[in-house]
Regions:
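A detector of single, family-specific signature residues
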Residues: 1-131
C-alpha cells in the first residue's frame, strides 16, 4: 500500500480496510479534524438526551463503507488484540453494553486512523514541496 503503508501496521487493519480509509480520506484539506472524520464515518455519538437523562445514540448517517471498515477493524481487534479485549472487559465492568463498547471503540479507531492519515499527508506534502 504505497499511499499510506503506516496504516497496515495498526492492529486489525488489512489491505482492503486501509484502502477504504484512504478512499474516504481523499486528500489533506477534505477533513479538518478528527471529529469531522468520525462524523464522516458515522461513529461520532449523537446526543439523545431528554429531561434529566443524558444519553448518546449511534449515528446512522455518514459514509457507510467507511463505517463498515471501522467496524471490521473493531471486530478484528476484539478477537485478536489483547489491549482491546482488556478495554472491552473494563467497559463491561463499568456497565456498558456491547453496542456501546463497539461505538466507543470505533470512535477511538477513527481517531487513530485520522492521526495516521494526517501525519502521512503532511510528510508527503513536505517532501513534495522540498523536491
Amino acid at each position: 500500500m504505497a499511499a499510506c503503508p503506516e496504516l497496515l501496521d495498526l492492529p486489525g487493519v488489512g489491505v482492503i480496510t486501509a484502502a477504504q480509509f484512504i478512499i474516504s480520506w481523499s486528500h489533506l484539506d477534505r477533513i479538518r479534524s478528527e471529529a469531522a472524520f468520525a462524523s464522516l464515518a458515522g461513529v461520532a455519538p449523537i446526543p439523545a438526551s431528554s429531561g434529566n437523562t443524558v444519553r448518546h445514540r449511534l449515528n446512522r448517517s455518514g459514509d457507510r463503507q467507511l463505517n463498515r471498515a471501522l467496524h471490521t477493524v473493531a471486530l478484528s481487534r476484539l478477537q485478536h488484540h489483547q489491549e482491546t479485549r482488556a478495554y472491552a472487559a473494563r467497559r463491561t465492568n463499568e456497565g456498558k453494553s456491547s453496542r456501546d463498547i463497539k461505538r466507543c471503540l470505533k470512535r477511538a479507531i477513527a481517531r487513530e486512523i485520522y492521526r495516521q492519515l494526517q501525519a502521512h499527508a503532511k510528510t508527503a506534502n513536505q517532501e513534495q514541496h522540498a523536491a
